[in-house]
């Protein structure tokens, strides 16, 4: 509930001349008019003073119904409408007051205020001039003169704005319109004109703001909803575009342009929603196909091409297809060098390709634009660890497999290399020592990469067989010498090797 007196202070600031109604005595009582009407008026006045606007409005509705020719009832109802922010509803009541009582200057002055805000300058000027001719109070006279000067200034500015617009000087037109709309805040046509200027100047979001205001100020404004929808569409915001075009069709279901646009946006929206659902389910190949369809469905709006490629880049990265990911992500970054999502996804692809310097560079670039992103921070730390690790022993390189190799590929590579570098194959002492070292590295690589837990540690930049990288120290529990690997069967999934190789 609004505190008593708050409505009075609000009206005093915004509609000072309406406060006169609180002191107006109901003249109809002296003429023997319906006592019920008087009761509604008095109760409504008390409720209005207490800030109970809805209840006050009900009382004034009843008073108008009881006495349709009572100007006080209309005036007080107009006051409530204005206090509720319903200027459209207040205007007819003020007009009725003036029709019933021509010399009621407070009502005419207030109507002039409303007409000025609506941009109806000729009508506003007419009201202010009539106030000055009707023997007004000193305060009313001063206010009418001030508003008349303001209305005249708005006429001049509007003429300049229209001339600038016709001359394609949209920057100047916007400057003039800015000044007018500070006063004529409810002028839908001027907001639509400024929106056109913003569109010409390449500022669609400012245009949308004006058009949204115009859609509320003018009833059944299908044109505004259509333009808002198309602007959102051009910006790549298909969901808001769909929402706005639906508002147009609610007003006119047969609107040809809105219906045609609706079908296009709905089709595109369905494809994108389907693609995102596939990504959530980890079905990256299918999602890629959907986004390729998006680009075919809307080839003329660059935003959808960029966004689609950005998501395809993400799919390739998550699906561990680094070559494709790097190619598509790079295309996105050529169009949008600061695209954080593309930078992150390309960095992940670089990690798979063991291009650590490039990954670090991408993560650092992404961090410049989003320094609080935990994923970027963790990715950068991982890339730095892997770079450091690559300068030491790299188990993937030892086995000659990619970082995203499956366990089966790892075992196959291990068996091949274990046979190739088994020390029994070498008779020369120097070659045998070299083979022993190679064989130990090959066996160590197999041990780490075939164990999910150990492999994860290594992938995160920590060598589980390196004592220096093990927290807590205390030596390397996985250290092996050649002797400990003798008798090891590279073709066994575990257990001791039961025989030695013999070569002719």
UniProtKB/Swiss-Prot annotation:
Changing residue 104 to A: Reduces binding affinity for misfolded proteins by 40%. Pfam families: DnaJ, TPR_1, TPR_16, TPR_19, TPR_8. It comes from the Eukaryota. One of its GO terms (cellular component) is cytoplasm. The keyword Endoplasmic reticulum applies. Its main location: endoplasmic reticulum. Widely expressed, with high level in the liver. Induction: Up-regulated during an endoplasmic reticulum stress. GO terms for biological process: cellular response to cold; endoplasmic reticulum unfolded protein response; negative regulation of apoptotic process; negative regulation of endoplasmic reticulum stress-induced eIF2 alpha phosphorylation; negative regulation of translation in response to endoplasmic reticulum stress; positive regulation of translation initiation in response to endoplasmic reticulum stress; proteolysis involved in protein catabolic process; response to endoplasmic reticulum stress. The J domain mediates interaction with HSPA8. Binding to misfolded proteins is mediated by a hydrophobic patch forming a large groove within the first two TPR repeats. Involved in the unfolded protein response (UPR) during endoplasmic reticulum (ER) stress. Acts as a negative regulator of the EIF2AK4/GCN2 kinase activity by preventing the phosphorylation of eIF-2-alpha at 'Ser-52' and hence attenuating general protein synthesis under ER stress, hypothermic and amino acid starving stress conditions. Co-chaperone of HSPA8/HSC70, it stimulates its ATPase activity. May inhibit both the autophosphorylation of EIF2AK2/PKR and the ability of EIF2AK2 to catalyze phosphorylation of the EIF2A. May inhibit EIF2AK3/PERK activity. This is DnaJ homolog subfamily C member 3.
């Amino acid at each position: 509930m609004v505190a008593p007196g708050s409505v009075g202070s609000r009206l005093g600031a915004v509609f000072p001349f309406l406060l006169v109604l609180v002191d107006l005595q109901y003249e109809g009582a002296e003429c023997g008019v319906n006592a019920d009407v008087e009761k509604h008026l008095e109760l409504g006045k008390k409720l209005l003073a207490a800030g109970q606007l809805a209840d006050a409005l009900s009382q004034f509705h009843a008073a108008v119904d009881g006495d349709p020719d009572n100007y006080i009832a209309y005036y007080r109802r107009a006051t409530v409408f204005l206090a509720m922010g319903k200027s459209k509803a207040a205007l007819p009541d003020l007009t009725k007051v003036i029709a019933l009582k021509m010399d009621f200057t407070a009502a005419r002055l207030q109507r002039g205020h409303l007409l000025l805000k609506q941009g109806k300058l000729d009508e506003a000027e007419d009201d202010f001039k009539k106030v000055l001719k009707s023997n007004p109070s000193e305060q009313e006279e001063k206010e009418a003169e001030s508003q008349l000067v303001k209305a005249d200034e708005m006429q001049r500015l509007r003429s300049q704005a229209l001339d600038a617009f016709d001359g394609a000087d949209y920057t100047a037109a916007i400057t003039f319109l800015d000044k007018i709309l500070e006063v004529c805040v409810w002028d839908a046509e001027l907001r639509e004109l400024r929106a056109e200027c913003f569109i010409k100047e390449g500022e669609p979001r400012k245009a949308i703001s004006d058009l949204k205001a115009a859609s509320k100020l003018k009833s059944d404004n299908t044109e505004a909803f259509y333009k808002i929808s198309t602007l959102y569409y051009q910006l790549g915001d298909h969901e808001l575009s769909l929402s706005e075009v639906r508002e147009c069709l609610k007003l006119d279901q047969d609107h040809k342009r809105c219906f045609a646009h609706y079908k296009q946006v709905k089709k595109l929206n369905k494809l994108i929603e389907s693609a995102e659902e596939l990504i959530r389910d980890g079905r990256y190949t299918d999602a890629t196909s959907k986004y390729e369809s998006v680009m075919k469905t809307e080839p003329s709006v660059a935003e959808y091409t960029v966004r689609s490629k950005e998501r395809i880049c993400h799919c390739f990265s998550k699906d561990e297809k680094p070559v494709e990911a790097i190619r598509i992500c790079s295309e996105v970054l050529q169009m949008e060098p600061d695209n954080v999502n593309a930078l992150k996804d390309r960095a992940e692809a670089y990690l798979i390709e063991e291009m650590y310097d490039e990954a670090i560079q991408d993560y650092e670039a992404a961090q410049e634009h989003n320094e609080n992103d935990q994923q970027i921070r963790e990715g950068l730390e991982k890339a730095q660890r892997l770079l450091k690790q690559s300068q030491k022993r790299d188990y993937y390189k030892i086995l000659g497999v990619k970082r995203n190799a499956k366990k089966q590929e790892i075992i196959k590579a291990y068996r091949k290399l274990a046979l190739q570098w088994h020390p029994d194959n070498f008779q020369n002492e120097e070659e045998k020592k070299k083979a022993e070292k190679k064989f130990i590295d090959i066996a160590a690589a197999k041990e780490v990469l075939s164990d999910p837990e150990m492999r994860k540690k290594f992938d995160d930049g920590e060598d589980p067989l390196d004592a220096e990288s093990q927290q807590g120290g205390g030596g390397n529990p996985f250290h092996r010498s050649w002797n400990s690997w003798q008798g090891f069967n590279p073709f066994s999934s575990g257990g001791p090797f039961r025989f030695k190789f013999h070569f002719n």
